[in-house]
């Protein structure tokens, strides 16, 4: 019992056993000094049985396996291997009141432990654990040593005196290294999921003590608290280190380091894609920025003894303090003055109002931004460098074109080269002379700003006009000139409108000469009859070359009415100016409501927008949607006329497949109220079944239902014969029929009711428009057969059909599209001439034993009937309005294409009984329009009829 020497004991009541036991003075606190210790019951060891809820692993003893749950305790003085712990955190994470779970005492060892939700592994001073896995909701409280702990959503709390080595922190895991504690060789894979520099301190690693040789991977985050220190940390891409305390020897291999107010970072190395950000009140000392690395020092931040290697980037302003060396020597940024700064590879220096910079070099990827009231002298701009300034700044230096300057007092600028994100704003009263705007450069002019000399816009360059602007020199445009209040690029390309409640003020750009080099001028226009737009004024000179004009229709809606007179003047040639024919052209179609607008040059050298006499291509395209859907419905219902050629006493099921060509001739087009010219194809599959077959009052009565699925695709032409677009229609139909046959005379009647859901898409070069709708149809058909000979029959027929259609309204890029209710009536008169052979199959004659009773020996033995059916179809009382327009008064245009006309139709078919209960049929037909706008085309069909 030597292990109990120098230990005092007392009697305590064990509420579990209901007895008094002898316990050490440490029992109440589980062996924790000052309230945190392990209980050891002498009675449990020597005389009383040990309960399963409280187990003790004695020194020198080894236990393997087992689970702790439901308030179980395991106190380890020896060795415990492979335990699973799911209890101990009854009072929450890292709470001193917790007394359950596994307790590793001085000299105790635990290996390969798994801690699950609600579980606690407590490692007291002198205890050690290895290879513990802690899952979500579990925790490890450490005052001893822990090696190779894995946090799979669990937590590790390293207390004073505790050492955690090789901990791996996975998703949603957290390691808290408290004051006086140490964590070495930690791998952090979580913590940064909330975004860069987000203060989500409940995952990843939080350091209040010391962290050494930490590796931070993608999504990993280390937060160094004010009292904490992190030494020799490596941060990879997607990971970051947040420093409120001290960070020493950090290496950023694509990762980020944020140095906050009061934080210090020493000897940081920023490699490719790495980024050190020093915030206000933060300090970075001896930072080395290698190629493609970045150091950012915010206003009020400090970075001293910086080594900026070639290709490294410095981002700062004259409100920060930065000192160090670059490839040209020493540089400083302090007290509102910058000297010797090199900017490249994403580097940027902001010279603020009242501050100054001298000897600044701006290389490829670098940016020098000088605020109004700021001053930069001795600037060297090389290719790819960017200057950002306005006419209130003072800047002088050299660029690829020679010397340049901006006088902040007079507002005069000369020789600027703007590229690669560079921009210059000419304020009211200012002037920019001989300006070159390169790729990704922007020249902005406020109202009252002006240009002089040669203004050159390269491909990819922009000039933005925020008011009336005058150029007394030449403009050479291979880029883009844009008036303000423009739509976004995506919206402009789709001819969308710049919507807003504020009134639009139109502006003028006046220049002596304009040379177009394939550039674009984006202008705003109102197509509501007000004849208002932005204008280009050529004053006394000439417009040559090629310039594309792109117009955006502005206002609260897409306004579109016909222009009057000469139209809307958009280019004004004044004081004897001339414009070459072909100097301007529309960069994209301009449409509003039902109209196309074209750009026209008049004899006065001015250029005007005018509405075309012909409507835009979408007018006939959308109008044809009504006709196409109704044609399909009629053909589908008409296919039933030839389904019942074989009569019998049994119910039957019929499967039909039909395809064909469908079209309408040009009969004057939409302008004359006719259906637009079109041609295309269709196809459908139809399944039909009899439900009831009976005899009533000397008549045979058959009822049934059918369903069909089909598709049609029709190319539509404009009135001038040009392609308008394509309409595609996916249709699903349900119908029912009632067939009556007078037994003695053979007089018959067929009644059909049908409904079809149409899903249509109309595609033109400029629009994709979709509409859904329902079609309804009712048909009454009758016929009376006469026998010409024993095997030849003539049957006069008459059919009346009514159909209707309703399509949803919609919107395209130029305005609304509305459909009125469509309807049409059809009368078909004709006759059917065909054989009238007995279709009784009889006995089988096949030579094959398996088919002897059900098949014929040859095709010649099959019962066969043929028929031909010529008809005249008259379409009348067709209706169907299609309206297009906008919210502008007078913009609405209504079109009512007529389907009225006469068609000659010829159908022919053949049917053969191939089994006692199976009949196959084929048919083909041709329809030709002889007057009006009725449909024409050809078709083919195959039918399988099975009786049962």
Specify the residue positions occupied by each region the protein language model found:
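Extracellular beta-solenoid/beta-roll
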Residues: 323-326, 378-403, 407-546, 552, ...
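Gram-negative bacterial Sec-dependent N-terminal signal peptides
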Residues: 4-5, 9-51
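Outer membrane beta-barrel transmembrane domains
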Residues: 735, 818-948
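Outer membrane beta-barrel translocator domains of Type V secretion systems
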Residues: 612-797, 802-804, 808-810, 898, ...
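Intrinsically disordered, low-complexity Ser/Thr- and acidic-rich flexible linkers and loops
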Residues: 90-96, 193-202, 490-498, 841-859
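Outer-membrane translocation/initiation segment of Type V secreted surface proteins
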Residues: 2-3, 10-24, 522-525, 532-533, ...
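Short, T/G/N/S-enriched strand-turn elements that build extracellular solenoid repeat scaffolds
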Residues: 55, 63-68, 80-95, 110-116, ...
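Extracellular beta-strand repeat scaffolds in secreted/surface proteins
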Residues: 74-76, 100-104, 119-123, 138-142, ...
């Amino acid at each position: 019992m030597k292990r109990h020497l120098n230990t005092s004991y007392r009697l305590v009541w064990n509420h579990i056993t209901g007895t008094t036991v002898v316990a050490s003075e440490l029992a109440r606190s589980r062996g924790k000094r000052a309230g945190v210790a392990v209980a050891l019951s002498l009675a449990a060891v020597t005389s009383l049985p040990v309960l399963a809820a409280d187990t003790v692993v004695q020194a020198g003893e080894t236990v393997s396996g087992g689970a702790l749950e439901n308030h179980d305790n395991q106190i380890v003085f020896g060795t415990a291997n492979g335990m699973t712990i799911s209890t101990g955190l009854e009072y929450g994470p890292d709470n001193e009141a917790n007394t359950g779970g596994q307790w590793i005492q001085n000299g105790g060892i635990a290996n390969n432990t798994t801690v699950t939700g609600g579980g606690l592994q407590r490692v007291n001073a002198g205890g050690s654990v290895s290879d513990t896995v802690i899952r979500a909701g579990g925790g490890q409280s450490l005052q001893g040593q822990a090696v190779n702990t894995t946090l799979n959503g669990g937590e590790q709390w390293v207390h004073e005196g505790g050492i955690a080595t090789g901990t791996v922190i996975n998703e949603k895991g957290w390691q808290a290294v408290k004051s006086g504690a140490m964590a070495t060789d930690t791998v952090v894979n979580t913590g940064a999921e909330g975004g860069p520099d987000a203060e989500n301190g409940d995952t990843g690693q939080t350091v209040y003590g010391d962290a050494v040789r930490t590796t931070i991977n993608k999504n990993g985050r280390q937060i160094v608290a004010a009292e904490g220190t992190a030494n020799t940390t490596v941060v990879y891409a997607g990971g970051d280190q947040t420093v409120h305390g001290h960070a020493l020897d950090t290496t950023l291999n694509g990762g980020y380091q944020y140095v906050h107010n009061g934080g210090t970072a020493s000897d940081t190395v920023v490699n490719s894609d790495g980024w050190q950000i020093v915030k206000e009140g933060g300090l970075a000392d001896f930072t080395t920025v290698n190629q493609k690395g970045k150091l950012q020092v915010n206003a009020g931040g400090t970075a001293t003894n910086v080594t900026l290697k070639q290709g490294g980037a410095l981002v700062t302003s004259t409100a920060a303090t930065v000192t160090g060396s670059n490839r040209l020597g020493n540089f400083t940024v302090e007290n509102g003055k910058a000297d010797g700064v090199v900017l490249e590879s994403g580097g940027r220096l902001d010279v603020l109002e009242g501050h100054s910079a001298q000897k600044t070099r701006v290389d490829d990827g670098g940016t020098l931004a000088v605020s109004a009231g700021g001053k930069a002298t001795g600037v060297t701009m090389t290719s790819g460098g960017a200057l950002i300034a306005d006419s209130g700044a003072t800047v002088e230096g050299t660029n690829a074109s020679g010397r340049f300057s901006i006088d902040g007092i007079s507002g005069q600028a000369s020789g600027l080269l703007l590229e690669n994100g560079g921009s210059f704003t000419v304020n009211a009263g200012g002037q920019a002379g001989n300006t070159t705007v390169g790729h990704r450069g922007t020249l902005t002019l406020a109202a009252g700003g002006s240009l002089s000399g040669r203004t050159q816009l390269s491909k990819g360059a922009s000039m933005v006009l925020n008011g009336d602007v005058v150029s007394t020199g030449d403009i050479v445009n291979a880029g883009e000139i844009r008036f303000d209040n423009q739509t976004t690029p995506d919206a402009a390309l789709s001819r969308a409108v710049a919507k807003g409640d504020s009134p639009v003020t139109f502006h003028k750009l006046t220049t002596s000469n304009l040379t177009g080099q394939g550039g674009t001028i984006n202008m705003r226009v109102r197509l509501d009859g007000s004849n208002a737009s932005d204008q280009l004024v050529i004053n006394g000179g000439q417009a040559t070359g090629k310039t594309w004009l792109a117009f955006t229709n502005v206002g609260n809606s897409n306004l579109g009415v016909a222009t009057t007179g000469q139209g809307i003047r958009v280019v004004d040639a004044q004081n004897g100016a001339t414009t070459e024919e072909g100097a301007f052209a529309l960069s994209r179609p301009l449409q509003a409501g039902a109209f196309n607008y074209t750009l026209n040059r008049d004899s006065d050298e001015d250029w005007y927008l005018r509405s075309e006499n012909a409507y835009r291509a979408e007018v006939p395209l959308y109008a044809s949607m009504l006709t196409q859907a109704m044609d399909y419905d009629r053909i589908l219902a008409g296919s039933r006329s030839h389904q019942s050629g074989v009569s019998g006493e049994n119910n039957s099921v019929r499967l039909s497949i039909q395809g064909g060509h469908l079209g309408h001739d040009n009969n004057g087009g939409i302008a004359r109220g006719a259906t637009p010219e079109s041609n295309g194809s269709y196809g459908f599959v139809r399944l039909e079944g009899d439900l009831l077959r009976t005899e009533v009052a000397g008549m045979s009565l058959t009822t049934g239902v059918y369903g069909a699925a089909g598709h049609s695709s029709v190319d539509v032409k404009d009135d001038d014969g040009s392609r308008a677009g394509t309409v595609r229609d996916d249709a699903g139909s349900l119908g029912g029929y009632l067939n009556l046959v007078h037994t003695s005379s053979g007089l018959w009647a067929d009644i059909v009711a049908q409904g079809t859901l149409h899903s249509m898409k109309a595609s033109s070069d400029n629009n994709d428009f979709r509409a859904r709708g329902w079609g309804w149809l009712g048909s009454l058909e009758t016929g009376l057969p006469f026998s010409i000979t024993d095997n030849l029959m003539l049957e006069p027929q008459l059919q009346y059909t009514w159909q209707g259609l309703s399509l949803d309204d919609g919107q395209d890029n130029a305005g609304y599209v509305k459909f009125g209710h469509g309807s049409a009536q059809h009368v078909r008169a004709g006759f059917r001439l065909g054989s009238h052979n007995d279709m009784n199959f009889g006995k089988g004659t096949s030579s094959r034993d398996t088919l002897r009773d059900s098949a014929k020996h040859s095709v010649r033995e099959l019962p066969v009937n043929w028929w031909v059916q010529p008809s005249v179809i008259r379409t009348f009382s067709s209706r169907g309005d299609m309206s297009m327009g906008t919210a502008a008064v007078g913009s609405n245009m209504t079109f009512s294409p007529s389907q009225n006309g006469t068609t000659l139709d010829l159908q022919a078919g053949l049917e053969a009984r191939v089994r006692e209960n199976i009949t196959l049929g084929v048919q083909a037909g041709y329809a030709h329009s002889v007057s009006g706008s009725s449909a024409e085309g050809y078709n083919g069909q195959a039918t399988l009829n099975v009786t049962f």
